[in-house]
Amino acid sequence: MAENKQNLQDAFLNHVRKTKVPVTIFLINGVKLQGVITWFDNFCVLLRRDGQSQLVYKHAISTVMPAQPISLYDGEE
């Protein structure tokens, strides 16, 4: 049986990217970044705000908080 499930981190980041939900990213050093996630991969996230992009390395991220509630549950298990 082939499992084709996406991990939670990728599902979350992809959802906020596709829906363009503004997020607040807290870094492990306490810095707060805000913007819209436009791209991500295994190692980093591209955050856009006011026409500027910031490349943020995932190892520096503590928390990603969307500006509004999101639902990742699609009713299937």
Swiss-Prot record:
Pfam family, one: Hfq
GO molecular function, one term: RNA binding
Alphabetized UniProt keyword annotations: RNA-binding, Stress response
Keyword RNA-binding: yes
CDD domains assigned to the protein according to its UniProt record, in alphabetical order: Hfq
InterPro entries: Hfq, LSM_dom_sf, Sm
Family recorded in the similarity comment: Belongs to the Hfq family.
Subunit structure: Homohexamer.
Protein name (database record): RNA-binding protein Hfq
Species for this entry: Jannaschia sp. (strain CCS1)
